[in-house]
Amino acid sequence: MAREEPCPNCGKMAEIVSEGDREILRCAACGTERVIVGMEEILPIEKKLVIASLILAIILLGILYYISYQMIAHLYT
């Protein structure tokens, strides 16, 4: 037995259907389909970009720390 909820578009009762890891609200009256629960997959290229960004951020923080340390050490010599 399918669950039903009111359609946010027209207000009539719409059916909730499970497809894989997500639930879709389908309204037969107005033809609206909305994803209610779903996990968006992270693409491999996005993972690589995040890893590259983190590595670059760590390198830049190291450079900034080194420059700051050298400037502070220069003041006390």
From Swiss-Prot:
Major localisation: membrane
Keyword Transmembrane: yes
Record localization: Membrane
Membrane topology: Single-pass membrane protein
Transmembrane segments: 49-71
A single GO cellular-component term on record: membrane
Keyword entries, A-Z: Membrane, Transmembrane, Transmembrane helix
Protein name: Uncharacterized protein AF_1617
Organism expressing this protein natively: Archaeoglobus fulgidus (strain ATCC 49558 / DSM 4304 / JCM 9628 / NBRC 100126 / VC-16)
